[in-house]
């Protein structure tokens, strides 16, 4: 049985218990939400890994993308990135490799980390042929099965890219058309072969494979906007409608899902996108890359993504895909992964401060930091900081003889008031 089947039968599995304990909430609440598809716990039945809960009442989770490209094939480097991502606090990693021995890369990453691993099987299907459009539907489904057999916990499938959404795209005035790599492969295949997307047309077969391995489906946003000018258009919302229908079919088949969300969205349209997705997809967990809130920040897109992610979290985002400084520019380095992760962790924490479920725990962290700052307890501040090593290096780089920081020294407001209150109490 799948985890969702067990949950529907009232069974609190070890994975559900582990998630409930980690989140500090009642196991029955987690079970009920898994049964309804409001929480996903991506965990292939062929792989032992740390159960991670994504969705309602859960703390906001973070994914880190790693993987080779055809221009940069260094398997050892990508494995190290995956291990570093876990060490820096990622809750999942996705292997997006397109160059080299894809099976070897995936196998090594699966062995290297103890967190859920996701993939995009169509990348392997495309690599099986000289030209993307020459892959067959068998290539596509064989890739999904191969990944499932190897223990992949969740796969992105762009099943919402179909003939209907293609027609909406043709009628639109989009600047960037399609920027999803998997979405572009699917679109090109449909146009070349004159057929509908196999992942959509044969979705029931996809569900059979996913169910056999209890592999979660991440329903990809192949029509996500690639620039601010394309945000909130018909192709995007047409895909949301389709994905919502596929969520219902997945739940009926006892297959867990979460839904991927929009790429570039201005601040004032994020609420529309996120609430729209939640409504159209019946409360399924939402997995967002960003959204990026401006197009003019190459080199700083980890920041534009974190801004968008934090705002999106106000309206229901559950799972943030880390963006690195290399977005739109190059394959990310190990340092890019670290930088992107810490910025995304910051966004996730700001979401948790207001999210039902993790709110109390997040508030305790901030309150503890407030007391440490009041007491000028630097070691405690470094311990509580999202990146304590960085905080320590900055403080140590500009020394002061004061127990305050070098910005204010003896003129520190906290220090002055603390001493003033101390003198007043001594007089009393």
Swiss-Prot record:
Zn(2+) binds at residues 264, 328. [4Fe-4S] cluster binds at residues 405, 408, 412. Its cofactor is [4Fe-4S] cluster. It comes from the Archaea. Binds 1 [4Fe-4S] cluster per subunit. The cluster is coordinated with 3 cysteines and an exchangeable S-adenosyl-L-methionine. Pathway: Cofactor biosynthesis; thiamine diphosphate biosynthesis. Substrate binds at residues 65, 94, 123, 158, 180-182, 221-224, 260, 287. Its EC number is 4.1.99.17. GO terms for biological process: thiamine biosynthetic process; thiamine diphosphate biosynthetic process. It catalyses: 5-amino-1-(5-phospho-beta-D-ribosyl)imidazole + S-adenosyl-L-methionine = 4-amino-2-methyl-5-(phosphooxymethyl)pyrimidine + CO + 5'-deoxyadenosine + formate + L-methionine + 3 H(+). Keywords: 4Fe-4S, Iron, Iron-sulfur, Lyase, Metal-binding, S-adenosyl-L-methionine, Thiamine biosynthesis, Zinc. InterPro entries: ThiC, ThiC/Bza_core_dom, ThiC/BzaA/B. One of its GO terms (molecular function) is carbon-carbon lyase activity. Belongs to the ThiC family. NCBIfam families: PRK13352.1, thiC. Catalyzes the synthesis of the hydroxymethylpyrimidine phosphate (HMP-P) moiety of thiamine from aminoimidazole ribotide (AIR) in a radical S-adenosyl-L-methionine (SAM)-dependent reaction. This is Phosphomethylpyrimidine synthase 1. It comes from Methanosarcina acetivorans (strain ATCC 35395 / DSM 2834 / JCM 12185 / C2A). The lineage of its organism: Archaea, Methanobacteriati, Methanobacteriota, Stenosarchaea group, Methanomicrobia.
């Amino acid at each position: 049985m799948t985890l969702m089947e067990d949950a529907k039968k009232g069974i609190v599995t070890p994975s559900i218990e582990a998630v409930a304990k980690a989140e500090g909430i009642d196991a029955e609440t987690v079970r009920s939400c898994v049964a309804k598809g409001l929480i996903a716990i991506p965990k292939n039945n062929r792989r032992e890994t740390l159960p991670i809960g994504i969705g309602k009442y859960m703390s906001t989770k973070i994914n880190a993308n790693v993987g080779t490209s055809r221009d940069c094939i260094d398997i050892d480097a990508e494995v190290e990135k995956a291990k570093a991502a876990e060490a820096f606090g990622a809750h999942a990693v996705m292997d997006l490799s397109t160059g080299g021995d894809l099976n070897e890369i995936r196998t090594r990453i699966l062995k290297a980390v103890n967190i859920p691993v996701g993939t995009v099987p169509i990348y392997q299907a495309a690599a099986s042929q000289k030209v993307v459009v020459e892959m067959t539907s068998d290539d596509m489904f064989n890739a999904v099965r191969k990944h499932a057999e190897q223990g992949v916990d969740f796969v992105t499938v762009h099943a919402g890219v179909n003939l209907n959404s293609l027609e909406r795209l043709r009628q639109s005035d989009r600047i960037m058309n399609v920027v999803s790599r998997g979405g572009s492969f699917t679109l090109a295949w449909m146009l070349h072969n004159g057929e509908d997307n196999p992942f959509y047309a044969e979705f029931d077969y996809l569900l059979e494979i996913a169910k056999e391995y209890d592999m979660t489906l991440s329903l990809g946003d192949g029509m996500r906007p690639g620039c601010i000018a394309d945000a909130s258009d018909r192709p995007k919302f047409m895909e949301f409608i389709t994905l919502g229908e596929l969520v219902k079919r997945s739940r009926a088949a006892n297959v867990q899902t979460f839904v991927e969300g929009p790429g570039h969205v201005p601040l004032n349209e994020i609420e529309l996108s996120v609430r729209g997705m939640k409504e159209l997809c019946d409360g399924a967990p939402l997995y967002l890359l960003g959204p990026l809130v401006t197009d003019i920040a190459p080199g700083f897109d980890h920041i534009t993504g974190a801004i968008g992610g934090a705002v999106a979290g106000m309206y229901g985002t559950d799972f943030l895909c880390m963006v690195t400084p290399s977005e739109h520019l190059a394959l990310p380095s190990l340092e890019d992964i670290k930088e992107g992760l810490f910025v995304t962790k910051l966004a996730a924490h700001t979401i948790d401060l207001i999210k039902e479920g993790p709110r109390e725990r997040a508030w305790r962290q901030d309150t503890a930091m407030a007391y440490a700052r009041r007491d000028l307890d630097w070691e405690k501040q470094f311990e509580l900081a999202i990146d304590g090593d960085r905080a320590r290096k900055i403080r140590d780089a500009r020394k002061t003889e004061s127990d305050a920081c070098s910005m204010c020294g003896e003129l520190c407001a906290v220090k002055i008031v603390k001493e003033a209150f101390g003198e007043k109490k001594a007089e009393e």
